[in-house]
């Protein structure tokens, strides 16, 4: 049932066509009439980055994806512009096209760029959090006084130095 490209009359000239046919058969087997049914079956209880990745993977399997990562990156840049506009407009976070919605769109597209490059967004964010923690610890250790007694300029200078030092160690 699941291998029509081998055992049945289904015609698939390319590997992409095989994958599309495969997804259609998997949906039929699960009683899902459409890709929308398939994506609605992705559990809401998953961490949001994993859920976004699953949604994007399912729709990509039927051809609903960017062909090139650079195109997805352009869309991410567009979403960042929309976020900037929402911030500058003073719209409340929960308003339509407000900051909350636009931040969500930025995260969703960043996840898409990661997926297209074979990077698990959840893992990438975990690593970024660890890197932030390391840098912040270095800032605190090098400050020589409580951080709440440092000016913004001092904190930024300490951050740049911590980033430079830690990045040099990881090379």
Question: What is the meaning of each model-derived region?
Answer:
Residues 1-103, 108-171:
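Flexible "arm" and connector segments at domain edges
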